UniProtKB/Swiss-Prot annotation:
This is Palmitoyl-protein thioesterase-dolichyl pyrophosphate phosphatase fusion 1. The lineage of its organism: Eukaryota, Fungi, Dikarya, Ascomycota, Taphrinomycotina. GO terms for molecular function: dolichyldiphosphatase activity; palmitoyl-(protein) hydrolase activity. Essential protein. Removes thioester-linked fatty acyl groups such as palmitate from modified cysteine residues in proteins or peptides during vacuolar degradation. Required for efficient N-glycosylation. Necessary for maintaining optimal levels of dolichol-linked oligosaccharides. InterPro entries: AB_hydrolase_fold, Dolichyldiphosphatase_PAP2, P_Acid_Pase_2/haloperoxi_sf, P_Acid_Pase_2/haloperoxidase. Keywords: Disulfide bond, Endoplasmic reticulum, Glycoprotein, Hydrolase, Membrane, Signal, Transmembrane, Transmembrane helix, Vacuole. One of its GO terms (biological process) is protein N-linked glycosylation. The active site is at S125, D245, H298. It is a multi-pass membrane protein. Residues 1-24 form the signal peptide. It catalyses: S-hexadecanoyl-L-cysteinyl-[protein] + H2O = L-cysteinyl-[protein] + hexadecanoate + H(+); a di-trans,poly-cis-dolichyl diphosphate + H2O = a di-trans,poly-cis-dolichyl phosphate + phosphate + H(+). Disruption phenotype: Cells show lethality and the dolichyldiphosphatase domain alone can rescue the lethal phenotype, but the growth rate of these cells is slower than in wild-type cells. Cells containing wild-type palmitoyl-protein thioesterase (PPT) and inactivated dolichyldiphosphatase reverse the growth retardation phenotype. Cells containing no functional copy of palmitoyl-protein thioesterase are viable, but abnormally sensitive to sodium orthovanadate and elevated external pH. The gene is pdf1. Residues 25-405, 450-488, 541-552 are lumenal.
Length: 622
């Protein structure tokens, strides 16, 4: 719901916890993935993986990816981790100078004997861009084949985090970018700024950007020819794109293309500047560069397709059948995505409940609306992609069943968005239910600035923390939304709307129990609780019935929010008992705005104020 705000909160939060040692060059390590299979004696070339933004080598998804690659290739697998721990690694994805990070990784690769004879490389999201940078600049990085999944090779023209339809978020981000993106400090410390590119300020981009302009040969520099020659040393460069990528903008960047920033039209790789400047034309003519497109969103692909890529480009000795072939054939659509074992287990629980008829039956895979797209040549499809024909057949549905055109859809965007068919009253009503958190947010702001009660500010602060937790969990699990929703954006687990309502319900009920315990069992209180839970039911149901989320994402979102809400009531109470709130009220800014903390300490506050007002009017009339 607050994807843009969450990104900014995470950015600022990183600086609050940033230790002084982080101003030095971070320590970068290569973590070797070890399994109980022939991992050391094999002559198979190893694979090096560089993860994407907000991820770590030990996350659920990356762990499964690494283990899967190792089982398929029967060789060693290394994962690049930046920093001393997982938090440092996540932070390094946002903050740091890329040239320094790449130099350190290059040195470590050079010191790793098992990589001296060459290796394969797999880059997820921005990790693919960094691996290509290694291939072009690091002599020790003898990469044979490089696969990049959703990597912004041509750059990005906005910070990741805004949905395509969230106009307010986009306006805020573009304003921030316009004010400071070209500043030397930003260019040397913010990772995404170092591959930010816009043709609307192309002169400033060429003048101030020192990473992407050199990497893509958009300016003349000392290593211009070397960049081209080093790319030619690759046996294969495979750029995988996702048709509905909602993280990389423009999404065509993942296939070495761009977008006409005036008309919005796609600029194909062959018509873009990199085709000549980076020598991509020669790679295409030599059969070394392949661009592949999948129909999902960012990093959404079937395990069978992923396995096929690994076997085709990373396997030294081709085998007719692998030990994973049977296990990767999908039984339902959910299990085929790039998801973690934990989320798969959650989905399995819901499958069990569906089998017990406790929930409505899930939609069949063949009912999901996916666009047909050829990703390999016909002669290769049977051999390399054994499940493609099944996938295409399942996705070849009538256009009439798909979403209506953008002109026939109405939408509202206030920190969030929803779509509905104008002639469908049911979906319109459900869409309005999705706006309940926004309405509550407006009420928060209104009460804060009219009542000026510290308790309201603390509750609102808890919602901000709740949103941050939602963002961290989403980027860690990377669980997708339903594939048949055209405009749902970002990852889906857990639902932020449901988590918001879970926090709101828990906080309001627990607050009553803590500060109004003598009244919390009255009929009036039960009526209030029923309203909170009814509103929560409306919101959660709308997110599921409108196909913005799977049922698991809604249920777990509400549970997480409810838990955070209970904890936040306890935490605020603890701060009061320790005198922290009293200290806060003594601060000059809070005194200037007359912030007070009276609600928890006075019962029937509204009735008392009403009586005082009535008494004052009577005295004035007399």
């Amino acid at each position: 719901m607050l994807s843009c705000s969450s990104f900014l909160i995470f950015f600022l939060f990183s600086w609050v916890l940033l230790p002084m040692k982080s101003f030095a060059i971070p320590i970068i390590s290569l973590d070797k993935v070890r399994l109980a299979i022939n991992d050391g004696a094999s002559e198979q070339l190893p694979v090096v993986i560089w993860h994407g933004l907000g991820d770590t080598p030990t996350s659920f998804t990356l762990t499964e990816v690494s283990q899967r690659v190792q089982k398929l290739t029967k060789g060693a697998v290394y994962a690049i981790r930046v920093g001393d721990n997982e938090f440092e690694d996540i932070k390094a994805g946002y903050l740091g100078k890329l040239e320094d990070q790449l130099d350190e990784v290059c040195d470590l690769i050079g010191n790793e004997d098992s990589l001296s004879n060459g290796f394969y490389a797999l880059g997820l999201s921005q990790g693919g861009l960094f691996l290509r940078a290694l291939a072009q600049t690091c002599d020790a990085a003898k990469i044979r084949s490089l696969i990049t999944l959703g990597s912004p090779h041509s750059g990005i023209n906005t910070i990741p985090g805004c949905s395509p339809t969230n106009l307010i978020c986009k306006a805020v981000v573009h304003s921030i970018l316009g004010l400071g993106i070209w500043h030397s400090w930003i260019q040397n410390h913010v990772v995404q700024a170092q591959y930010y590119r816009t043709e609307k300020q192309y002169d400033k981009y060429l003048e101030n950007n020192k990473f992407l302009t050199h990497l893509n040969n958009e300016v003349l520099h000392d290593n211009y020819t070397r960049n081209i020659e080093k790319l030619k040393e690759l046996d294969n460069l495979v750029a995988v794109s996702f048709e509905r990528d909602d993280i990389v903008e423009p999404p065509y960047s993942t296939g070495f293309g761009w977008i006409n920033e005036t008309t919005g039209e796609n600029i194909e790789m062959e018509d873009f500047v990199l085709y000549e400047s980076l020598g991509l034309k020669d790679l295409v003519n030599q059969g070394k560069l392949e661009t592949i497109s999948f129909p999902g969103r960012h990093l959404q692909m079937r395990w069978g397709d992923f396995d096929a890529l690994v076997l085709k480009y990373f396997k030294d000795e081709k085998e007719e059948k692998t030990e994973l072939e049977e296990s990767t054939r999908p039984s339902n659509f959910l299990s085929t995505y790039f998801v973690s074992p934990l989320v798969s287990a959650i989905d399995g629980t819901v499958d069990y409940l569906h089998g017990k008829s406790l929930f409505p039956e899930k939609r069949n895979f063949k009912e999901l609306t996916m666009r047909k797209r050829s990703i390999v040549t016909p002669e290769d499809s049977e051999e390399v992609y054994p499940y493609i024909s099944e996938f295409v057949a399942a996705s070849n549905v009538s256009e009439e069943k798909g979403p209506k055109s953008f002109a026939n859809l109405a939408f509202i965007t206030i920190f969030s968005h929803f779509f509905y068919h104008i002639d469908d009253m049911w979906r319109s009503t459900l869409g309005l239910f999705s706006l309940i958190p926004q309405i509550i947010g407006i009420i928060y702001l209104t009460v804060m600035f009219t009542g000026r009660e510290l308790d309201t500010f603390m509750q609102f602060g808890g919602q901000v923390v709740n949103e941050f937790i939602n963002y961290v969990v989403k980027v860690s699990l990377k669980y997708p939304r339903p594939a048949d929703i055209e405009y749902g954006v970002g990852y889906g687990m857990p639902s932020s709307h449901s988590q918001f309502m879970g926090f709101f319900s828990a906080y309001m009920i627990a607050w009553d129990y803590k500060y109004r315990r003598s009244q919390c069992f009255s009929m009036l209180s039960f009526a209030k609780y029923a309203i909170y839970l009814t509103l929560s039911t409306f919101v959660c149901s709308s997110r599921y019935l409108l196909d913005f989320h799977y049922l698991t994402q809604v249920v777990y979102g509400y549970m997480i929010g409810f838990g955070v809400g209970l904890f936040w009531v306890y935490l605020v109470g603890k701060l009061r008992s320790l005198g922290v709130t009293k200290w806060l009220l003594s601060l000059p800014p809070l005194q200037f705005f007359y912030i007070k903390d009276t609600i928890p300490h006075s019962k029937d506050n509204h009735k008392r104020q009403w009586l005082e007002s009535k008494q004052f009017k009577n005295q004035k009339s007399n």
